[in-house]
Regions:
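Pyridoxal 5′-phosphate
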Residues: 2-6, 12-449
Length: 449
């Protein structure tokens, strides 16, 4: 056998898997036609990227009977994403494995390329996942640690960060330490957060696990300043001893005009089905090259070069880190393949305009809530310490009761922070208008009148 490794693309991988033997043409070409006809039959929404489309919420199929301020939990697909999903779904329904053979190699790469363009990184640094939680699990399960090494996280992080770290602690005795960054979120400051982080980093700290925007309060961490503090702590350390700044970025990704590279983080996990308005059940992990070297794959990839390595009885050393850490197996293909359209939607809208719009609506909501007697806004007013999430306490009333009354009495959809301390939570986004915010404010005011 030649020392030169054979190249095998994903199509060949599927053929070798016995799924596509003898398939030479795209079955179900009518699937494309059917999907196009279905898209044309929808209401006449403006195309993403047009001038009208920048303020036209008709791109989303949200129930007009409600003011929905919870699309940050699970996105409503904009029209271009719906069309792409239906196009691929029609092809898969008509041709199944035949369509998969034709489409999968191209559209998987297109999804990764679009994500990389949005992130401003090489595509080989991007792993595709199903969610933030999956990405965090992959990150923390196989972070290379030695006895005595520790991971520092915070008391403000979500279950999706705490639980994989707890499981890792059980598995091999890794030390996980939690710190507190602030007491009252509405009074937080950049200096206080950075001081808390700096004081927590020790010689055996190997990773700092944080969340960009806290879903418990709406606090947005000053990641650039935290990254600078980590860099100072890393002076004089070798590559293995270096502290990695690992981030759950889901409530900033798609809402903020910044990328993980801009922010100076090392590892970044996010779902694409929240503020990005991408296909439900999609996500990604990005890591810098030095950070990928510290993360071992968990689930076998279906990348063709890794399959060749298996055939030839060797390790997949030539597979780039992003594809190597993309979990293999069959998944919701039509949703992952529509990621490209989601990133294009944001590109055409303008990432800076998305952030500006999101902040403007959140500011309107925070200021309005603060003017209502009995309401304490827990999210900082400072836009450098907040994003789109807005949390508040209403006359010390149970948040769950308030959410139910808002929905039943006022047709306003809000949520409860999923933590031991519960607040009423809103998330105005580009799927909303000023009138939605005003209606929510009127509803809250009526509850405390």
């Amino acid at each position: 056998m030649s020392d030169e490794p054979r190249r095998l693309d994903r199509r060949d991988f599927l053929v070798r898997g016995g799924l596509l033997a003898g398939a030479t043409t795209l079955a179900g070409a009518g699937g494309y036609v059917a999907a196009r006809e279905l898209a044309r039959s929808e209401d006449d929404a403006q195309a993403a990227g047009s001038e009208a489309g920048k303020t036209d919420t008709r791109q989303f199929l949200l129930d007009p009977a409600y003011v929905n301020l919870t699309t940050f939990l699970l996105a409503s697909h904009p029209r271009v994403v719906r069309e792409a999903i239906e196009r691929h779904r029609s092809g898969l329904d008509a041709g199944t494995a035949l369509y998969l053979r034709q489409a999968e190699p191209m559209f998987e790469d297109e999804a990764r390329d679009a994500a990389a363009e949005y992130l401003g990184t090489p595509a080989e640094q991007v792993a595709l996942t199903d969610s933030t939680t999956m990405g965090l699990g992959l990150m923390y399960a196989r972070l290379r640690l030695e006895p005595g090494d520790e991971v520092v996280t915070t008391e403000h992080d979500f279950y999706a960060t705490h639980e994989p770290l707890r499981l890792r602690e059980q598995l091999d005795g890794a030390t996980v330490r939690r710190i507190r960054l602030y007491e009252e979120p509405e009074n937080v400051s950049v200096d206080a957060i950075v001081a808390a982080v700096s004081g927590a980093l020790r010689p055996r700290t190997r990773a700092l696990a944080v969340t960009w925007v806290h879903s418990s309060s709406g606090v947005k961490l000053p990641l650039r300043e935290i990254a600078a503090a980590v860099a100072r702590a890393n002076r004089g350390r070798n590559d293995r001893e270096r502290i990695l700044l690992c981030v759950d970025g889901v409530h900033g990704f798609g809402a903020e005009d910044a990328s993980p590279v801009d922010l100076g983080v090392d590892v970044f996990s996010s779902g694409c089905h929240k503020w990005l308005f991408g296909p439900r059940g999609t996500g990604l992990v990005w890591a810098a090259p030095h950070a990928w070297d510290r993360l071992a794959p968990t689930i076998p990839t279906f990348d063709g070069s890794a399959y060749v390595a298996w055939i030839e009885g060797r390790a997949p050393t030539q597979t780039p880190a992003g594809p190597l850490n993309t979990p293999g197996g069959f998944h919701s293909f039509e949703h992952r393949w529509a990621l490209k359209e989601a990133f294009e939607f944001h590109r055409d809208f303008g990432r800076d305009k998305v952030a500006s719009r999101t902040h403007a609506l959140a500011k309107r909501l925070k200021e309005g809530l603060a003017s209502i007697r009995g309401v304490t806004v827990k999210t900082p007013m400072d836009e450098s310490l907040s994003a789109g999430l807005v949390c508040c306490d209403v006359s010390r009333r149970p948040a769950r009761e308030l959410v139910e009354r808002l929905r039943e009495e006022h047709k306003v959809v809000a949520s409860v922070t999923p933590y031991a301390t519960e607040y009423l939570r809103f998330g105005p986004s580009i799927a909303n208008q000023e009138a939605d915010v005003d209606r929510a404010l009127e509803a809250v005011a009526s509850l405390v009148a």
